[in-house]
Amino acid sequence: GYYLADCFGLRLLNRRGCFPQFDKFIEQTKDVWTHMLDIRKRFEPRAEELAKKYALAPYTMFIGSGALWGETILFSMCILEEMQWKRTRYITSADFFHGTLELVEPGVPVFLFMGEDENRKLDERVRAFLTRGVTGDTDINIIDTAEFAIPGLDDDFRVIVSPWILT
């Protein structure tokens, strides 16, 4: 999964002198899956509620950026569109204000995936717009990886594990 692929890539970077904190990362993530399981268990009731609420929505919008952009596409296109034949629209936080905001209207569920990297300011800008209520849409759902603690993990490593959290 992600852990092995990321560790492999980070080790290669380490060997080239580009990720000197590799050993520290490995030490701090050795038990990360116990925390991931806990996160999943805590989120499961919300996930079930969202699934029931939006299962029959005509289409759903997913917004993400940076380290979470791959997960945004994976869930929207691969899981919902290709596997479940659900109509979705995935958009980056940076592109949201270039027309997509006009598609936000009552009855259209919107999910904003907020990460912890340099794109967070863009995510916060989208959140501010969506939660102001100017579109009349009340189906705004924000999933912020910063809300899910991983004890013993340095903040510098959260950007690496935020896709794991979202998945």
Regions found by a protein language model. Name each.
Residues G1-T167:
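A SIS-like phosphosugar-recognition module
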